[in-house]
Amino acid sequence: MTATAEVETPKMEKSASKEEKQQPKQDSTEQGNADSEEWMSSESDPEQISLKSSDNSKSCQPRDGQLKKKEMHSKPHRQLCRSPCLDRPSFSQSSILQDGKLDLEKEYQAKMEFALKLGYAEEQIQSVLNKLGPESLINDVLAELVRLGNKGDSEGQINLSLLVPRGPSSREIASPELSLEDEIDNSDNLRPVVIDGSNVAMSHGNKEEFSCRGIQLAVDWFLDKGHKDITVFVPAWRKEQSRPDAPITDQDILRKLEKEKILVFTPSRRVQGRRVVCYDDRFIVKLAFDSDGIIVSNDNYRDLQVEKPEWKKFIEERLLMYSFVNDKFMPPDDPLGRHGPSLENFLRKRPIVPEHKKQPCPYGKKCTYGHKCKYYHPERANQPQRSVADELRISAKLSTVKTMSEGTLAKCGTGMSSAKGEITSEVKRVAPKRQSDPSIRSVAMEPEEWLSIARKPEASSVPSLVTALSVPTIPPPKSHAVGALNTRSASSPVPGSSHFPHQKASLEHMASMQYPPILVTNSHGTPISYAEQYPKFESMGDHGYYSMLGDFSKLNINSMHNREYYMAEVDRGVYARNPNLCSDSRVSHTRNDNYSSYNNVYLAVADTHPEGNLKLHRSASQNRLQPFPHGYHEALTRVQSYGPEDSKQGPHKQSVPHLALHAQHPSTGTRSSCPADYPMPPNIHPGATPQPGRALVMTRMDSISDSRLYESNPVRQRRPPLCREQHASWDPLPCTTDSYGYHSYPLSNSLMQPCYEPVMVRSVPEKMEQLWRNPWVGMCNDSREHMIPEHQYQTYKNLCNIFPSNIVLAVMEKNPHTADAQQLAALIVAKLRAAR
């Protein structure tokens, strides 16, 4: 052993000496390389030098002594290289370090603020940032925060509320469980439950058997909800053994529930072999009412609702119905309907979880379901839950009512039946704001009253309508606005009444004149639109004050055969002429009242009152009649029919000159229903009347007169008004300014057909006042001259000297507005040639 050791030692020494010899050479080469590297890069990393040295050491595998020597050589080199950087830092490097620290602080604060905005606690955020470091990404921080939050919720640590102090998230997560536990524990808030055992058992047994298992299922459902006060009523006879007519299953459940003091048997007994059963429903309702609980049953207890009113209301509000789905007891979530409380609130004395009832709509204001949306809309809290169509209907009704109440007034007139005296209701006529109109007063007034009203220039703003015939009247001595004649008092285009021969041509000429449909005048004679001032009628059956059109279909034309029938009556002197007509009509027409020419223009008789006769006689004597230059004018006025009682009062007091003067006028009367014994003036003879064909006869249909004409005297007959029997005037006024005074023309067979079309009228021009100031005169016996207007009479006479008078008259009747004699002559020649 020793020999081998000795042999080994010299070998080792020799090898060591060889390594020592090689080491200086390697060191010198390494130093040269190191010096060159230092010159190349004075700031090279020390790690590279250490790596090189380590590589060299590994390759050479130095011993411990050799490693020490190597370290001695490397240490001073490191100090020389790194001494300027580490021991003596420059100013630029220190500023860079300070800027880096500031950037880290800013990032830290930014992440802290961002996490705080999300609702996380400051302590939690700090712990996460300290764990991950300030240089961590924001996504990593958020992920760690979320992980910590979920971990705290899963572990159920309540102390983690420090992590989420802001926002309702932590409270919302923990509140449902806690609130439900509190409610379950708080049994005082749950209502007592009274179960109709018979109803529940039979429902579970599908109406075929009494299934006690259904009662157990219902009880278990309420026990799971936390109810402790549960009572089940079952008749006592259900404890008996099952019979084929009354099968019972699982009777042991009844005994079990009875021991638990949940089930109660209602009394029943046998009397002489018969079972006497107490009414268990009364027990159920009474206990539930007294304990302020709920009733679990599908029975409505209609018989008990009648017994007590309080029970009726209680049953309606506290009855909980149910269903069995196989072996599952299922009450409805809305026991009282869609708009009633939820099941949770229904089972409790104090409602909870109101957010379930008023859950906000997820669409918010963008919801398009409207009033049908089952979710809660806070912006619609005060709005009615109606559809858009219902809202439009209601708004339309309100606007209509408002318009009617503000801008219109319904005016109604009443007419009396002529024979039976029956009162007929008038159709409403709309007129704007007529309450203060003095014309809407009763017409039952004395002549003195309406005479005083007639002399007021501004008595009324209601204009009267003007007839196309433009009958001149005598104005009063005082100057005031001249009222217009009422159309209904001037014309009657009914079968049997006369159309002038010139009317057809007048109607044709009217189209070229472009007259407005209906014109009226105000108190100063200015024409204004009738349609604008007064709206149209709502019904053709209306007896309104301003109507110009009549419902001609109401006329009874069966009793009117031909014009000879009426002419014969005129020849027999059936009708008399009122001598004081001029003064009467003068007073009437000067009124602007809408009743003026409608009430007071009479033909054949005036008021029978003595004072009225005296007044009319006085007014007639004050205005002496002077003849026209050609004096062939006929008065065109209203007609009137009287009953037999009027005929007994005798004729009016009149002077003989007046009677003689007016005796030359043709008679104008009403229908043949007027009594034939009506007296005529003594000095008027039938022969004094002209031919029937020359007379302007105005008739009234079926002896119907205006009821307003008789209101001053209750003895007179009351008849419906004339306004629905007659149409408007026959034709408009002539267009020339000097042709307003028309004379009556003879009757023409071609114009005897009834006129069913409404005719237009015009208002009275102011220039007509001058013509109306001329009094009337009697008629001449010349049958042709009284047909021609004054301004055409000379032309007519000249043409008659050349052509046949009948042809001249026919042409002038056909062309009443043609005043040129040459044009008329050309027309006459053309007619003569056509006749050949």
Swiss-Prot record:
EC number(s) given by UniProt: 3.1.-.-
Cofactor field: Mg(2+)
One Gene Ontology term of the molecular function aspect: mRNA binding
Keywords assigned by UniProt, alphabetized: Endonuclease, Hydrolase, Magnesium, Metal-binding, Nuclease, Zinc, Zinc-finger
GO cellular component: cytoplasmic ribonucleoprotein granule; nucleus
Zinc finger (C3H1-type): 355-380
This protein's record includes keyword Acyltransferase: no
Compositional bias annotation for Polar residues: 50-60
RNase NYN domain mapped to chain residues: 190-345
Bias-annotated ranges (Acidic residues): 35-46
Any Pfam family: Regnase_1_C
Bridged cysteine pairs (disulfide): none
Region of interest called Disordered, as start-end residue ranges on this chain: 1-92
UniProt biased composition (Basic and acidic residues): 8-28
Ranges of Basic residues composition bias in the record: 70-80
Keyword Nucleotidyltransferase: no
InterPro entries in alphabetical order: Rege-1_UBA-like (IPR040546), Regnase_1/ZC3H12_C (IPR040757), RNase_Zc3h12_NYN (IPR021869), ZC3H12/N4BP1_RNase_Reg (IPR051101), Znf_CCCH (IPR000571)
Source organism superkingdom: Eukaryota
Family under the similarity heading: Belongs to the ZC3H12 family.
Function: May function as RNase and regulate the levels of target RNA species.
Protein name (record): Probable ribonuclease ZC3H12B
Lineage of the species this protein comes from: Eukaryota, Metazoa, Chordata, Craniata, Vertebrata
Gene: ZC3H12B
